[in-house]
Structures are given as C-alpha cells and as structure tokens.
Amino acid sequence: MLRGVITDIDGTLTDEKRRLSTAAIETIRKLQEGGIEVVLSSGNTSCLLKGLCKLIGTGGTFIGENGGVYRIGFQGSMQVMANRDIAVKALNLLEEYYGKKGIRLELYSHQERYSDIAFAREVPVEEVRSLLSGWPVDIMDTNFAIHIHEAGIDKGRTFHIVAEQLGIKPDEFLGIGDSENDIGMIKAAGTGCCVANAQEDVRNISDYCSSVPYGEGFVEIMRMYFPHILAR
C-alpha cells in the first residue's frame, strides 16, 4: 500500500514557464491531509525548499541539491550529505577553461548551496563531463541547470535515508519526476512515474507516464493512484 509520495518540483509540479501548478498544490494538500506523506525532492536550495514546504502544505520533509541535503519535518535539522570542496575545485577548473574562451558561467544561488555547484545550461553538458573526466564528481543536467557534486550523491540514495527516518519503506512510496536527476529516486520508490514532458531515459524506467505534461500530469497520476483520497 502506498503511504508516501516523493516528487520533483521543476517540470513536475510546475508549468512550462516554471510557475507552480495550483492544481498540483491543491492535490498535494489533499494527499497530506489524507495521511499521505509528501516529500519534495529537488536540485534547488534548502532555502527555497523550506519555504515551499510551508507554502504548499507538506509535512516539511525535503531533499535538496539533488540529494546533497535533506531535512525531516519542520523541526528537523538540515543534514548535508556531500563535501562541497571538490565541486568548488571543479568549478575553478571550468571557470579557467571557459574564461579563456570569453565565457562566464552564470552561477545559481552560489552562496545558498551546501553540497553542490549549479550554473546555467549555456555550455554543453557533455563538454563539462569531458573536462571533468577522472574527477570524483558527478555532473547532472536537470533541464534547468547543470549541477556538479561529489560522486555518489543523488536523490535516490538520500531518499532511502529519508524514508527510513520517516518510518515508511521506500516501496511504500510513489516517486515522480521528469529529468535524469530523478532516475535514482524513481527507481528506489516502489512505484515510479513520470510526467509526459519527461526525458526519454526517465520514461524508460517509469511504471507509468502521464498523458499530459507538467503539473497537470502530476495531478493525473495522483488521481490514478490515490482515488480514495482525491475523489472526495
């Protein structure tokens, strides 16, 4: 029996302009009120996720920075899963390389990140991976940003820790997302789903893909798996 939902945000709870879907928010509130633990899981910062948990209406548990940080409930302390130093050193190499080409990397929320580096998708991600080949880092393309973090960190690994601390088995969760950074999380959940705008590799490992994209697709899937709550 499903007791929880772990969901990506950008591209999953939003529309094509990255605006939060009000239908998705209302659905999450109904799930939470119906006894389903909803966990937000994102590549974004803990600062943003703390606010979103409160404003959307979850129980306060989140995974941020693609698994690099997490918090259990509103009263929990934020935990950091990775050493950011190696990501910063990798960034220094990239800035030197691209600087010689007259390209300046646009960093995202640099001062608010504890475990990773994120920057705009203005350079080819495969080139970044090639430049950092042999480094103990992982490069993640979320469709919204390129992320660098210590090797071995991802949403799926941290999800196992979060599930244990919540007292809910991973196979009692429905996982849903749209990008490559969601694959580990979707695989770790008992039921894995994606929205219609998902990348092909995400669609290939999902149990079900919605017929409509973005937040409306999220709502479709939640209604399919939780009719006893959302039919009210």
Curated annotation (Swiss-Prot):
Annotated GO molecular function terms are: magnesium ion binding; phosphoglycolate phosphatase activity
User: What is this enzyme's EC?
Assistant: 3.1.3.18
Enzyme category, top tier: hydrolase
Q: Look up the record and name the cofactor or cofactors this protein needs.
A: Mg(2+)
**Where do the annotations place Mg(2+) binding?**
D8, D10, D178, D182
Spell out the InterPro entries in the cross-references.
Answer: HAD-like_sf, HAD_sf, PGPase
The organism's superkingdom is given as Archaea
Q: Which Pfam families match?
A: Hydrolase_3
Q: A single GO CC term, please?
A: cytosol
**Residue ranges of coiled coil:** none
Q: Which reaction does it catalyse?
A: 2-phosphoglycolate + H2O = glycolate + phosphate
Q: Which Gene3D superfamilies match?
A: 3.90.1070.10, HAD superfamily/HAD-like
Q: Active site located where? A: D8 (nucleophile)
Keywords attached to this Swiss-Prot or TrEMBL record, sorted alphabetically, are: Carbohydrate metabolism, Hydrolase, Magnesium, Metal-binding
In this chain, substrate is annotated as bound at K155
What's this protein's family per the entry?
Answer: Belongs to the archaeal SPP-like hydrolase family.
Question: What this chain does, per the record?
Answer: Catalyzes the dephosphorylation of 2-phosphoglycolate.
The name this protein carries in UniProt is: Phosphoglycolate phosphatase
Instruction: Look up and give the organism this protein is from.
Output: Methanospirillum hungatei JF-1 (strain ATCC 27890 / DSM 864 / NBRC 100397 / JF-1)
